[in-house]
Amino acid sequence: SDTRRMIVEYKFEIMTQEQAEEIAFNWHYDNEYSFYDMEADQEDLVDFLDPKNRGDANFVVTKDNDIIGYFSFNKVAINTIDIGLGMRPNLVGNGNGLEFLKAGIEFAKSKYSPQKITLSVATFNKRAIKVYRKIWFIEVETFMQDTNGDRFEFLKMSYQC
């Protein structure tokens, strides 16, 4: 019998326009997580759909040719990469986040060799914060930001590579 452990194979590829549109218009999250719908903020939507703006910083993550989610990687200081990420709505909340996040961190390390990785998360998103803490992101500070036509509190977190 075949007892080999399944190794999750994630592939990172630069996001195409078609993929950006698929994510922007068809990914809808439930309840308070609808905050993360691209269409919830016109400005974010326009930025996300603009290939020049996305540049080569946005990657789609696939597994067996299925889109699992996406990551953005932005160099914010000489040795610091700030990441953004999103998972396909029907995969959220089922314990897939940790593997997905780990894959993104590994990809960032191998591609950019940062000393530090940062991210910002809405403070109401306790579910995500728990996952970030699990792989040793630490809390840096909270800040207020205008988005989706309102002001929200965000938590900045940091990971030492």
State each model region's role.
Residues 91, 95-104:
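Conserved acetyl-CoA pyrophosphate-binding loop and the N-cap/start of the following alpha-helix
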